[in-house]
Amino acid sequence: MFVIKRNGYKENVMFDKITSRIRKLCYGLNTDHIDPIKIAMKVIQGIYNGVTTVELDTLAAEIAATCTTQHPDYAILAARIAVSNLHKETKKLFSEVMEDLFNYVNPKNGKHSPIISSITMDIVNKYKDKLNSVIIYERDFSYNYFGFKTLEKSYLLKINNKIVERPQHMLMRVAVGIHQWDIDSAIETYNLLSEKWFTHASPTLFNAGTSRHQMSSCFLLNMIDDSIEGIYDTLKRCALISKMAGGIGLSISNIRASGSYISGTNGISNGIIPMLRVYNNTARYIDQGGNKRPGVMAIYLEPWHSDIMAFLDLKKNTGNEEHRTRDLFIALWIPDLFMKRVKDDGEWSLMCPDECPGLDNVWGDEFERLYTLYERERRYKSIIKARVVWKAIIESQIETGTPFILYKDACNKKSNQQNLGTIKCSNLCTEIIQYADANEVAVCNLASVALNMFVIDGRFDFLKLKDVVKVIVRNLNKIIDINYYPIPEAEISNKRHRPIGIGVQGLADAFILLNYPFDSLEAQDLNKKIFETIYYGALEASCELAEKEGPYDTYVGSYASNGILQYDLWNVVPSDLWNWEPLKDKIRTYGLRNSLLVAPMPTASTAQILGNNESVEPYTSNIYTRRVLSGEFQVVNPHLLRVLTERKLWNDEIKNRIMADGGSIQNTNLPEDIKRVYKTIWEIPQKTIIKMAADRGAFIDQSQSMNIHIADPSYSKLTSMHFYGWSLGLKTGMYYLRTKPASAPIQFTLDKDKIKPLVVCDSEICTSCSG
């Protein structure tokens, strides 16, 4: 039996050669648990005559990946095999790869179709010796298999459907794409990215340095006008943004309700639902960058709109398909008055924005005055109990996980953009709170800090965190200036207000590395100090940029220009970790370069790449299946697996017990100290999660994507959670509602014979959303 080598030659299959290749990649791994011979034997079983060495490597990597539940080092081995395979298939020198990407010719029409921009190519040509010399390819081998496969599927650039970039090439392309001729800053960014201190957002990783360098993640739009022209002009904006991989949040509260008179045609409006069907079909039609990200929009509506009940049914599984928009996400922009009416079991008036104009343009006391004026004037379409609407909201959330909940008054009251006008919606993932109007489309560029990296020698390094955050601020400011904007209204907005969004990933990993239970007082204190540090570092860097380049255009009149920072708006006194008064004085003198700075986002894909838990979330499970575009992988909490193997507690019985319990270790006989640290989200009181969100909220000047997890949700449980979050002053009350099914699915690779029959399993292996 023979294999076909990369050079096309045939060679007889040799078991020892396969074993030797795998063994070479086992350096630094736990040899007590990693068995190259076992992997090689399974590879041999999959061989056929004429198999290629590329296929052999792919098979070996997949086999190693399936052994991850035995030891986390198998995930590293799997990645090393896959990375080594890629290295053998790609050129080494960064400059040569960039040259190939620039010189690409479309084989179908013979036209020169450069994948990277001419300026990127010019920079690389000028500094190629320096750039080539600083790249450290060994860092490619630090990715786990799951992270590498995510990169391979969607992030590494291809020519004729063949990957030509290595991960280090991608990171250097991103660094050069951001900093351009500032090579020293590009190298600094490259090193921080490749050492995994932080990551830029997916659109930046996709597009930096390319011919279409659209690096922004989030776009927020208001409906231009309640007219055919306004509706379709807005739709065109959405299409152009979605085409370039932007996620969209759209406010439609100014669109007239069904049954309303249309003076221009002497007709009657069909309301928002038929319009949203058109938007839904646009989202389905547009494919972002070759299946990298599907076209996605979140639609925001205020609950006084008289189409609210039909809106809440849009994503339900049953009912008339003509009244469903399954490809849109729905979100509510809730004024405090509605929450008060629900709390008091009061009545709620449903109105049409054409007959009751201006409600979407005001908030707080001004909204309450206008709304109650329209009530007194009987301009409403109908009156129902506020709790009838509330019940419909809860029922929709239990069935579909949506609508998202954001509190209009908190979002406006605590925004440093309050001086611009009323903010009418958030974005697709509920963490961006920015002003938009008919002439401006709000934009945000994102990056996230890998918090696990800052746990050094058993302590959290706040100074290093501040330094990395300052680099991120400088990077995101450069992106604002050089970005390719899909529509001019986005460029106008972004360059006037210069908002950025710094988030985090690996908060749960940092707690675990410090041996803090997620709901412990130590974790709650660290949670506050981390975000205090991020906010402080971001403000300091933004002020330093303002000293050099001037404040952003609309700085005057903002809270910050009057010496008021985010924590002041929450009536919170910061800790003594940082010296805030001198920073406030400096801001008064020089201003800020950015209107907004901090916005913890979901980080779904980038956390997968870096091997961290998502955003600020606890682990949803200790063993589960991950599903992404590249396939399905079984993942074990590597921290738990490492501690159990070190303490000689890991065995098949424990593995199967945990899998039978849906990833929980609470029903095992493991030591209590381990059980406390490795609680899943389902075992942590949701009020603790909400309280921690409010604690860090004082240092988050945008908002945060916060999911609510309730295994068995009910009207009373959800109502309690929502009102608790509202009472604490949260801006985002809920991103998704995550629940568990009534009965468990068949467990993945479960050996039932090795489970003691004392517990009946009724849990699922939970997967987090890819927001």
UniProtKB/Swiss-Prot annotation:
Quaternary structure annotation from Swiss-Prot or TrEMBL: Interacts with RNR2/OPG047 subunit.
Domain ATP-cone: 1-92
Transcription regulation found in the keyword field: no
InterPro entries in the record: ATP-cone_dom, NrdE_NrdA_C, RNR_lg_C, RNR_lsu_N, RNR_R1-su_N, Rrm1
Binding residue positions for ATP: K5, R6, E11, N12, V13, M14, F15, D16, K17, T53, D57, K88
Name of a matching Pfam family: Ribonuc_red_lgN
Class in the EC hierarchy, top level: oxidoreductase
This protein's name: Ribonucleoside-diphosphate reductase large subunit
Residues involved in dTTP binding: D226, S227, I228, K243, R256
Inducing stimuli: Expressed early in the viral replicative cycle.
Keyword Nucleotide-binding: yes
